[in-house]
Each structure stands twice: as structure tokens, then as C-alpha cells.
């Protein structure tokens, strides 16, 4: 994409990717539009942003998140769009500050069919939000994932098992606790929700991790903590403490809240707020119409009304105008998509040359 007011924010082949991305981010941070959005968020106004082409949205989102800090929740129109956005954000913020919060199900909560990888990613994102400190984090999600209510942060805090090197606890006590949380004993762990014991070694696969933990005991004391690879069984990282998180989806419905209620004072970035609200109510209507126990199922999921209530007074940035929550401020970024060249590289060369004569820089 090209920015009319300054250099083009178009990424092509680069010699030094990291330094080039830093330069692009620094240029974006100096634009008046980015500064306006930061000011709007700090003053807690609902802001509509326009004229953001291609990856410009991810670029400016990363700039604003870095400036304002905290937790930023980006709601895309669908799963694929959320995943693509997360991929763009990795380039600007780094993978450790970008999370993907999917649904727990392969298709829909209406059909069941739990998605194991989705449960792990979802739990990891929720844990990152609950334990957030320091630099901003950005969580990418979509309506079907927002539809499922989650265990309240207070209930999670009472459930998560935290173990540190040097802790005085027996393997038997730890075994009893994790079984109460629904973990299953196996010979060798290979997926979240499993644990194994042999000699003084206690392996366990938390639902918030993509690799299992290995706890080495000396008597009733935790001597060491490590992550390890499933395929080789070799340690990859030594740790000072670990959090063992169960499958939060299995908790009683009365302990659950909407994701908007769970995240608290986050900044919400909505691709299309009215579309999201319509999807929430449509999914809820279908679920309850097919449910054998509608009273219980109603507690498992959210609604448009609940989402609007839980985000009332929260900071929100809209990519499209909303009838349900009109913007108080509008900010235009004036970026343009790159021209379609359809493999006619002479056209690309001519365009780059013309832009250079106008004072643009090509990345």
C-alpha cells in the first residue's frame, strides 16, 4: 500500500528485514493519524478508522498498541481473517506479543467436536490475558470464538496449579490435585490433559502450552523444571516455575463469563461490530433452538446484548461505521492498495520509478 502523505508503506524484497520493518514502524508512528488514534484511545472515545489498505491495518495497530500498552483484542470477520491478521502482526510486534484466540470447536459449539489445538491456543491466549504485565499484547479472534463464554479469571486463579523449583510437595499430592482437575494418567504424555509418573519424574501437558513440562523430584522437593520435546523426550528449556492449566471448557457454566467480561479494560478493535453482533445472536438462536437443555446452554454462550453491555465504556476502534455503537471520532489514514500488476513486472518497475520521482521510498 501507498501512503499519500509520506513515504509508501509497501513491503517488497528487502536486504535487511528487521531494520526495514523498524524503519517502517518508526515512520508510521510519526504520522498524525496514528497519533490521533492514540489520543482517542487515551481519552476513551469510540473511534472509526478509514482508508487502511492491505497490511497497513496491522502496521498501525502495532504502533498504537505499542504506544498505549495493555491488552488489545482484534475481532476479525472470520477465522481466516483473524489468522492472517495475526501473521501480519508477528512481523511488527514479534510472536511472543501476538496471540490467536480460536473457538474450542472444529465447526461450531452446536455440533460439538472439540478441536484439541484450538483448546490449547484458546487457553494460552486467556492465560496471557489473565497474567498480562509489561508490554502490550494483541489477541486476534472472531465472532464464533467470542460466542463461547469462558471461566472467570477469579475461578481460573483458584484452579491453576503453580509449581516452582524448590517447592515442598510430594508427587502423590500433585497427582491427586491434577486428577481432580481432569488430567489423565498415561505411560507417556502426548497431548494436553495427560500426565505420567515414573521414578522421581512427573511429566504433565498443560492446556496452555504447546510442549509438556517435566518435573524432577528429590523426595518431596521439586529439584528441577523443564520443557521437553515429545518426539525426542529431550529437554528444550529449564524453568524456575510453571503453571499447570486444566481444560477450562469443562468447568461449570455458572463460573463462566463473556470474553469481554474476562478481559476487563482492554482495547477492542472491530473489523465490523454490527456483523459480529449479528453473528452472536444468530449462533445463539440456532443453539438454543436445537438444545435439549436451553437453560444450561444459555449460560455457556454470549449474546449481542451481553457483549455490548460488557464493552460499554471500554475503548473501541471501528474499521467500519456501526449503527449499534456510533463512532465519536473518525481518523483517515489515506493509504492506497498497490496496483494490480498480474505478473507484468514492467508495470511494477514503472510504478516504483514514478513513485521515487514523487519522493516515495519503496520497501
Q: Which residues make up each language-model segment?
A:
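ASCE RecA-like P-loop NTPase motor cores
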Residues: 2-363
Amino acid at each position: 500500500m501507498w501512503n499519500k502523505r509520506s513515504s509508501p508503506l509497501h513491503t517488497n524484497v528487502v536486504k535487511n528485514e528487521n531494520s526495514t520493518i523498524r524503519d517502517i514502524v518508526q515512520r508510521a508512528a510519526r504520522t498524525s493519524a496514528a497519533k490521533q488514534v492514540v489520543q482517542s484511545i487515551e481519552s476513551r472515545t469510540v473511534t472509526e478508522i478509514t482508508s487502511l489498505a492491505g497490511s497497513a491495518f496491522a502496521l498501525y495497530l502495532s504502533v498504537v498498541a505499542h504506544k498505549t500498552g495493555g491488552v488489545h483484542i482484534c475481532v476479525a470477520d472470520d477465522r481466516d481473517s483473524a489468522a492472517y491478521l495475526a501473521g501480519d502482526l508477528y512481523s511488527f510486534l514479534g510472536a511472543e506479543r501476538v496471540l490467536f484466540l480460536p473457538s474450542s470447536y472444529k465447526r461450531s459449539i452446536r455440533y460439538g467436536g472439540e478441536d484439541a489445538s484450538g483448546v490449547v491456543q484458546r487457553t494460552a491466549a486467556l492465560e496471557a490475558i489473565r497474567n498480562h504485565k509489561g508490554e502490550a499484547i494483541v489477541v486476534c479472534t472472531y465472532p464464533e470464538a467470542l460466542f463461547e463464554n469462558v471461566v472467570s479469571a477469579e475461578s481460573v486463579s483458584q484452579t491453576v496449579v503453580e509449581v516452582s523449583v524448590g517447592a515442598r510437595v510430594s508427587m502423590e499430592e500433585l497427582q491427586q490435585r491434577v486428577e481432580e482437575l481432569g488430567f489423565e494418567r498415561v505411560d507417556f504424555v502426548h497431548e494436553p490433559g495427560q500426565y505420567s509418573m515414573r521414578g522421581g519424574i512427573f511429566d504433565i501437558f498443560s492446556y496452555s502450552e504447546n510442549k509438556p513440562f517435566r518435573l524432577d523430584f528429590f523426595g518431596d522437593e521439586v529439584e528441577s523444571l523443564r520443557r521437553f520435546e515429545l518426539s525426542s523426550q529431550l529437554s528444550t528449556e529449564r524453568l524456575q516455575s510453571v503453571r499447570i492449566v486444566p481444560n477450562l471448557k469443562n468447568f461449570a457454566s455458572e463460573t463462566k463469563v463473556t470474553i469481554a467480561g474476562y478481559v476487563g479494560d482492554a482495547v477492542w478493535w472491530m473489523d465490523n461490530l454490527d456483523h459480529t453482533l449479528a453473528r452472536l445472536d444468530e449462533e445463539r438462536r440456532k443453539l438454543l433452538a436445537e438444545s435439549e437443555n436451553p437453560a444450561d446452554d444459555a449460560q455457556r454462550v454470549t449474546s449481542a446484548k451481553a457483549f455490548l453491555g460488557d464493552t460499554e465504556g471500554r475503548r473501541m476502534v471501528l474499521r467500519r461505521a456501526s449503527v449499534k455503537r456510533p463512532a465519536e471520532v473518525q481518523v483517515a489514514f489515506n493509504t492506497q492498495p498497490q496496483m494490480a500488476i498480474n505478473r507484468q513486472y514492467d508495470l511494477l518497475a514503472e510504478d516504483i520509478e514514478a513513485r521515487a520521482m514523487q519522493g516515495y521510498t519503496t520497501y
